[in-house]
């Protein structure tokens, strides 16, 4: 199900983390992730576990998430930004498979990918793959500030996630 958010994608990240974790759970996030990711983890009383993205030596920017380097054992949720600020796309399907195998939720901050579902010429969207996908309509889709979407694609009670931000 999909919900419109009027407090930006940050509220979607917070709702997602609060909905799928409990106090003391471990949440994996990128070392260079948006501040809202760490804030959501702290708000939930969870323990952040940081993942350092490998660097693309040619461009000097963080590369995509490398699933073979991610250890999700004991992790309750994984937060990924795709596309990244540099436009790097991670393999969301592969990440979801790893998370599912280890009982972790996958939260994708797709703030800059709101238009992905509308063209086969664009990268595949996380909307139908990840457990939670957050998109910012105001960044790439012409929405008013701070319009965003929260897509929930798991067995979590959606009303629990929404009650966290209402």
What name fits each language-model region?
Residues 4:
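A short glycine-rich, hydrophobically flanked beta-strand micro-motif that places a catalytic Asp/Glu
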Residues 7-166:
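Conserved PLP-enzyme active-site core in the AAT-like
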């Amino acid at each position: 199900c999909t919900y419109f958010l009027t407090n930006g994608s940050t509220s979607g990240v917070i709702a997602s983390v609060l909905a799928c974790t409990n106090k003391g759970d471990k949440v994996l996030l990128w070392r260079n992730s948006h501040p809202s990711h760490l804030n959501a983890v702290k708000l939930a009383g969870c323990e952040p576990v940081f993942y350092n993205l490998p660097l693309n030596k040619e461009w000097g920017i963080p590369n995509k998430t490398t699933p073979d380097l991610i250890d999700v054992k004991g992790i309750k949720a994984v937060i990924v930004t795709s596309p990244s600020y540099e436009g790097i796309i991670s393999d969301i399907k592969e990440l979801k498979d790893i998370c599912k195998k280890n009982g972790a939720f996958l939260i994708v901050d797709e703030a800059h990918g709101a238009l992905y579902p509308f063209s086969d010429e664009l990268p595949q969207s996380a909307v139908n793959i990840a457990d939670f996908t957050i998109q910012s309509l105001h960044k790439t889709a012409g929405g008013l500030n701070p319009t965003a979407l929260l897509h929930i694609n798991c067995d979590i009670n959606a009303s629990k996630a929404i009650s966290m931000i209402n």
